[in-house]
Swiss-Prot record:
Cellular location(s): Nucleus
Alphabetized UniProt keyword annotations: DNA-binding, Metal-binding, Nucleus, Repeat, Transcription, Transcription regulation, Zinc, Zinc-finger
GO cellular component terms given for this protein: nucleus
One Gene Ontology term from the biological process aspect of the record: regulation of transcription by RNA polymerase II
Taxonomic lineage of the native organism: Eukaryota, Metazoa, Chordata, Craniata, Vertebrata
Matches recorded under PROSITE patterns: KRAB, ZINC_FINGER_C2H2_1, ZINC_FINGER_C2H2_2
Gene3D superfamilies: 6.10.140.140, Classic Zinc Finger (3.30.160.60)
Name of protein: Zinc finger protein 891
């Protein structure tokens, strides 16, 4: 390696040409020696490093300082080119430190009162890296190089772990992962050069990982979901400002180096106390997916805006809320469709009748009323239906299931619509009123049948007595009064009835069923008419 004797300030000038002519030959010789001895004789960078005191450094001109920096960086390149990529230590030359000192003089003391510039001596080599908080206040982070005393043997163990887990180093160039608590300085390792920084006028070297060989496996398993290698070029060639992000639940700090000092966008996720700035974050592909990825209750990842939205859905089932009525939806697409009902926007129109609908699925169901298509068929009786919900309701006639029960009388129904109509009997509600005679009905179907009396449409007349009916079923029941037909027979006593409702009421005599209960005294009855008569007793007492 190119080791130079720089004991005096003028040594660089005397050895300039010799150093550059003999560099290649010297490097080849040193690499050969290194390959044969590195496993037997552990070596650190301090063995080949050359340091200046502050007084010596001030006596060098700019050309000598540049030469010193080039030689030191070349030594690092030689180390890292052997067999595998060694973990490089941070090098900021005394020239860079002088520029840092000049910049720090322009910083108000109140911002970082504890930061003092220490002269660089042979006993203490202090490294400094600039970073900015959102307030653009420049602070300094001290990294002491003399504490880094790990050997190449330790680095080789760490490299084997990296190779075993197949994690390329390039994937980690954007992130610095560190516990929020104080980290021992000996853990800071594996630094990578970035492009020329315009502020410092030198090459900055940032950490690729902060863990030694014994920490590598844990480090990679914990932050395995952060792999991303497409943004390394997005934040170079500009003033690099560092943003600090914290997850208060998992006690983790994440650093992101973005290329612009100005904060463009901010995203805050209050569930974990995580704060996100800038819209150029990498998107973890396996966020909350893999076993070794960061779980929700110990978030150790930096989320993209879209990932943040997805993560929020794991905490709140229905995140998107309508600002007009407060109704919430799990997906924003459903909310957008629902808002059309407030705006009166209807996009889908039936070509047959001109009726319009909010969504295409409702239109498709409606079109079946015109085409007569019935794709849903009962596998027991073969009856077909145009809608799947109608088939489900029909299947309950075979199974006898009646899941919808009236909480007042206990009567059960196979469909919710029947229960809604039934409840109007208890409330006395009659929403549908005839505009001709004012008569009201509790269902729209009854009103439609009634209107036929006024219009004369499809009027059914009894041939025996001349009485007219609006429905054919009503005519059939009436004809039975003339013929005496009683098709509905009780299986217990063989008594017959002309209508099915009369048979149902009769069967309750045998079963003892009394579904109609008084809510005031608790007395039950087998027929609703008996309950109505009973309620008059309570109303008469109240009036007295």
């Amino acid at each position: 390696m190119a080791v130079m004797d720089l004991s005096s300030p003028w040594a660089l000038t005397k050895q300039d040409s010799a150093c550059f002519h003999l560099r290649n030959a010297e490097e080849e010789r040193m690499i050969a020696v290194f390959l044969t001895t590195w496993l037997q004789e552990p070596m650190t960078f301090k063995d080949v490093a050359v340091e200046f005191t502050q007084e010596e450094w001030m006596m060098l001109d700019s050309a000598q300082r540049s030469l010193y920096r080039d030689v030191m960086l070349e030594n690092y390149r030689n180390l890292t080119s052997v067999e595998y990529q060694l973990y490089r230590l941070t090098v900021i030359s005394p020239l860079d430190q002088e520029e840092i000192r000049n910049m720090k003089k322009r910083i108000p003391q109140a911002i970082c009162p504890d930061q003092k510039i220490q002269p660089k001596t042979k006993e203490s080599t202090v490294q400094k890296i600039l970073w900015e908080e959102p307030s653009n206040a420049v602070k300094m982070i001290k990294l002491t190089m003399h504490n880094w005393s790990s050997t190449l043997r330790e680095d080789w163990e760490c490299h084997k772990i990296r190779k075993q887990h197949k994690i390329p180093g390039g994937h980690w160039r954007q992130m610095i992962y560190a516990p929020k608590k104080t980290v021992p300085q000996e853990l800071f390792r594996d630094y990578h050069e970035l492009e020329e920084n315009s502020k410092l006028g030198s090459k900055l070297i940032f950490s690729q990982s902060i863990f030694t060989s014994k920490h590598c496996q844990k480090c990679y398993s914990e932050i395995g979901c952060l792999k991303h290698n497409s943004i390394i070029n997005n934040y170079v060639k500009n003033s690099i400002s560092e943003k600090l992000y914290e997850s208060h639940e998992c006690d983790t700090t994440l650093w992101h180096f973005q290329r612009n000092q100005t904060v463009q966008k901010e995203y805050t996720y209050s569930k974990h106390g995580m704060h996100f700035t800038h819209n150029m974050f990498p998107v973890p592909n396996n966020l909350h997916m893999a076993q070794n990825a960061c779980e929700c209750n110990k978030d150790e990842t930096l989320c993209h805006q879209s990932s943040l939205k997805k993560q929020g859905q794991t905490h709140t089932e229905k995140k998107h809320e309508c600002n007009q009525c407060g109704k919430a939806f799990k997906r924003i697409s459903n909310l957008t469709l629902y808002k059309k009902s407030h705006m009166g926007e209807k996009q889908y129109e039936c070509k047959e009748c001109g009726k319009v609908f909010n969504d295409s699925s409702t239109l498709r169901r409606h079109v079946r009323t015109h085409t007569g298509e019935k794709p849903y068929e009962c596998n027991q009786c073969g009856k077909a239906f145009s809608q799947k919900t109608s088939l489900k309701a029909h299947m309950r006639t075979h199974t006898g299931e009646k899941p919808y029960e009236c909480n007042q009388c206990g009567k059960s129904f196979g469909t919710s619509s029947y229960l809604i109509v039934h409840k109007r009997i208890h409330t006395g509600e009659k929403l549908y009123e005839c505009s001709e005679c004012g008569k009201a009905f509790n269902t729209s179907s009854h009103l439609k049948v009634h209107k036929k009396i006024h219009t004369g449409e499809n009027v059914y007349e009894c041939s025996d007595c001349g009485k007219v009916f609006s429905g054919v079923s009503s005519l059939r029941m009436h004809i039975r009064t003339h013929t005496g037909e009683k098709p509905y027979e009780c299986k217990e006593c063989r008594k017959a009835f002309s209508v099915s409702s009369s048979l149902r009421r009769h069967v309750r005599i045998h079963t003892g069923e009394k579904p109609y209960e008084c809510i005031q005294c608790g007395k039950a009855f087998s027929q609703s008419s008996s309950l109505i008569i009973h309620k008059r007793i309570h109303t008469e007492r109240e009036t007295l």
